[in-house]
Every structure is written in structure tokens, then in C-alpha cells.
Amino acid sequence: MTSELINKSSAFNILVVDDEPANIDILLGVLSPHYKVKVAPSGALALKIAQQYVPDLILLDIMMPGLSGFDVIKALKSNPALNNIPVIFVTALGQGEDEEKGFELGAVDYITKPISPPLVLARVKTHITLAHQMKMTELEVKKRTAELQKSQQSAISMLAAAGHYNDTDTGHH
């Protein structure tokens, strides 16, 4: 089932956040043949869209007027409904300390501009696959935990019922 969903990549939603129309156009050209893509030209709009749309992945520029990419990821990670969305920084900032800060704030990857379209596609696919597999694993754990609790409750009920049959004719067994 996982491979079927991953092969249907257009089922996944990506939010691209960048204040430069040229960068948005490039990323749209790379991603839209494969994914459903929404665009936000500012950090504030990105947060609004993310709350309504809950994307599977966010590509986020760092240097933007108003809320920076660092501000946006902090807000995303502090919101329980949005904190599991993978965020990939796509930025012209190529310094090691910028990358380090991005990872410390919760980014899953970091792509420097100018971008390589095959690299962007590969990284997006990888992180969507990982996030999808994590969701599927969490669902399976919940399902198995519920089954285990049901079995445990059934065993307790059977033991309680067996206690009612404890009499002198059975040697108190």
C-alpha cells in the first residue's frame, strides 16, 4: 500500500513559500507535474495556508520580509497540528551556521539556490516518502495497541468469570 501511494505522487500536497516570483515559478515548474502545489509569497500567508491546507511538505525560503523562514518554522513546530510537516529550506544562504540553525529549528533538509531540479525532486520525494511511512507506522502502532488492550480486557473478563466457578466441587480451582 505504501508503494502505491508514493507512486501516485500527485496525491501529495506541497506548500512553496518564497517572496521572489521567479523562484516560485521555477519551483512550480519543477514540482507541479508531480504534486499538488500551493504558493505563499510571505511567511504570514504561509502559516494561514498551512493551517487550512495542512501540506505534506513545505519548501521554505529563509530571507523574506516580515516573518523570515526561521520565524515560520518556529511557529509551525510550536503548533501540534502542524509540527510533523517536513520543512525543507530552499535559500540563497549557504553558510554552515544558517544550515545548522535550520536543522536545530526542525528542518529536514536544506537546498541552496540556484536549485537543481532533479535534486529538488529527489529530496522532496524522499522526505514525503519518509513522512508517509512514519504516518503509516503510527497508525499501525495505534491499531495494534487497541487490539492488545481489547485482548487484555477479554482476558481479565475471562479470569473474572472463572472466579465465579471457584467452588468446593472443583477443589477451589
Question: Predicted segment positions?
Answer:
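Non-catalytic signal-transmission and effector/linker regions of two-component phosphorelay proteins
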Residues: 1-15
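Alpha4 helix (beta4-alpha4-beta5 surface) of REC/receiver domains from two-component response regulators
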Residues: 25, 52, 71, 83, ...
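Helix N-cap/capping motif at the beta->alpha junctions
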Residues: 39-48, 69
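Short amphipathic alpha-helix used as the core "switch/output" element in two-component signaling
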Residues: 48, 70-83
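Receiver (REC) domain active-site loop signature in two-component systems and cognate sites
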Residues: 64
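C-terminal output helix
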Residues: 97, 111-124, 128
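Amphipathic alpha-helical coiled-coil "transmission" helices that mediate dimerization
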Residues: 122, 129-157, 161, 165-168, ...
